[in-house]
From Swiss-Prot:
Alphabetized GO MF terms: rRNA binding; structural constituent of ribosome
Subunit structure of this chain's protein: Part of the 30S ribosomal subunit. Contacts protein S5. The interaction surface between S4 and S5 is involved in control of translational fidelity.
SMART domains with a match to the protein in the record: Ribosomal_S4 (SM01390), S4 (SM00363)
A Pfam family that the UniProt record links to this protein: Ribosomal_S4
Annotated InterPro entries: Ribosomal_uS4 (IPR022801), Ribosomal_uS4_bac-type (IPR005709), Ribosomal_uS4_CS (IPR018079), Ribosomal_uS4_N (IPR001912), S4_RNA-bd (IPR002942), S4_RNA-bd_sf (IPR036986)
Statement: the UniProt record of this protein carries the keyword Ribonucleoprotein: yes
Source taxon at top rank: Bacteria
Keywords: Ribonucleoprotein, Ribosomal protein, RNA-binding, rRNA-binding
Residue span, S4 RNA-binding domain: 98-161
GO cellular component term, pick one: small ribosomal subunit
The keyword rRNA-binding is annotated on this UniProt entry: yes
Coiled-coil regions listed in the entry: none
Name of the molecule in the record: Small ribosomal subunit protein uS4
Amino acid sequence: MARYTGPVEKLERRLGVSLALKGERRLAGKSALDKRPYAPGQHGQRRAKISEYGLQLREKQKAKFMYGISEKQFRRLFQEAARREGNTGALLVQLLEQRLDNVVYRMGFATTRRFARQLVTHGHILVNGKRVDIPSYRVEPGSKVEVIEKSKNNPQIVRAIDLTAQTGIVGWVDVEKDKKFGIFTRNPEREEVIIPIEERFIVELYSK
């Protein structure tokens, strides 16, 4: 299944949760979910009772859409998490957080992961001094992630940094906003990652 590219606000309303897909509108309280916190359609305000399988599937969809990845990529990450020692769900979240597009977003250089992905694919991002244009590139602890020199005054990047100054930066990155670079200092603990996803249902789904 390909990565979702449809109307993001309708998707958020269908799933009933903000997926950080419309950063600036969400921060301003102007997203469709803020205005109409129910599913789209004639009967949207009457949410149907969801089965256990439906709940498991919904949590997987939320994670895929939030991080902007395909079913194939998601399954591959889950399989890697399952092979490692430790809590599979927490390890899955950790692997998702290590994606370069997500790290660019977490450092505040983009208001959404979708825009962060564009910055990466269009060659605006360096990792440890080398240009990397692969959104799924895994950022290791201690890595330096920065905006290339000619893009440091990009209005969208500057605007994103201004907006994230209001919301704050996560604790596992150190960012020099003026110089447009950051250090991915460590992998986050699961409780630090504030996302509307219950990954235990994803583990149950893939463990069948």
